[in-house]
Amino acid sequence: MTEALISAALNGTQPELLAGGWAAGNATTKCSLTKTGFQFYYLPTVYILVFITGFLGNSVAIWMFVFHMRPWSGISVYMFNLALADFLYVLTLPALIFYYFNKTDWIFGDVMCKLQRFIFHVNLYGSILFLTCISVHRYTGVVHPLKSLGRLKKKNAVYVSSLVWALVVAVIAPILFYSGTGVRRNKTITCYDTTADEYLRSYFVYSMCTTVFMFCIPFIVILGCYGLIVKALIYKDLDNSPLRRKSIYLVIIVLTVFAVSYLPFHVMKTLNLRARLDFQTPQMCAFNDKVYATYQVTRGLASLNSCVDPILYFLAGDTFRRRLSRATRKSSRRSEPNVQSKSEEMTLNILTEYKQNGDTSL
């Protein structure tokens, strides 16, 4: 017992939250929750990286879409909404970074905790659906270029984007009920990334429904679109075509995001919830610890899409790279006259000072 207390103090954990433990409650007996030291360093490190790169990348993307990408194409509408979802999410990361550096002691209140988890899930499933829209848009443009001319208009993309936002907010709204804060035995405050044990059974059902309808089905649609896109690129005469290049980039980037960020997160989240519900025997505690630790890793990976998406705009967007280069050149040209005028002003001031002092050697 003494060794457990010392280990808990060194790792910033509670005795009842040590790995591999077996806790006896008033009514039930179950494996104790894992709270290992790596979580306090891995997650904030990942979130700092995502915040810096995601904030800069999505700020530039939004600036480009608003000021330099007019008039928008249909795919630009989807990409702007994707950038907006990512930008809103990265704005919430500083509070989460502090939370983990503070040994997961939440100080911002229950409402902010609910909002934090709500925005994460809105970004997660909003990004998945907007990537699906982008993929379907590219599929129709490559595989059915003539039939899709009317369907790819900007107005239709605006309608679809509005529907996506409404759908995501409606589906994710229950998170505002399930998430929240809780008080640990040592009086610190936790901000649940899923939910408290008392709501776990119903949350598992809700989580499975969102996984199927907001992840699995869009992923199947994307795989189908990309399979047909690759087939069209192979059999159609699109050599050296910008559309061919952008389509290849789109396939590679989106599939990478799903393979690295979305798929591992949903698999491990489901397994972790199932372990909390049904794998509560002494023989399963060590397995549960590994599941929980892996789930924490995938939580960090799930946030990486917010800093990867700007690469998608740059490589697969309509004229994004060319217009970004043009915008930066314009900015540099505007700064050159300012530098020159400042230099002339400094020279004039120096000459005036010398003349006032009676020095005419210049």
Curated annotation (Swiss-Prot):
Organism this protein belongs to: Gallus gallus (Chicken)
GO cellular component, one term: plasma membrane
Main location as per UniProt: membrane
UniProt topology in membrane: Multi-pass membrane protein
This protein's UniProt keywords: ATP-binding, Cell membrane, Disulfide bond, G-protein coupled receptor, Glycoprotein, Membrane, Nucleotide-binding, Receptor, Transducer, Transmembrane, Transmembrane helix
Residue sites binding ADP per the record: 35, 192-194, 272-276, 292-295, 299
Cytoplasmic side: 64-76, 137-155, 227-249, 315-362
PROSITE patterns from the UniProt entry: G_PROTEIN_RECEP_F1_1, G_PROTEIN_RECEP_F1_2
Protein's recorded name: P2Y purinoceptor 1
List of glycosylated residues: 11, 26, 102, 186
Gene name in the database record: P2RY1
Transmembrane segment boundaries: 41-63, 77-98, 115-136, 156-177, 204-226, 250-273, 293-314
Family of this protein: Belongs to the G-protein coupled receptor 1 family.
Any one GO molecular function term: G protein-coupled ATP receptor activity
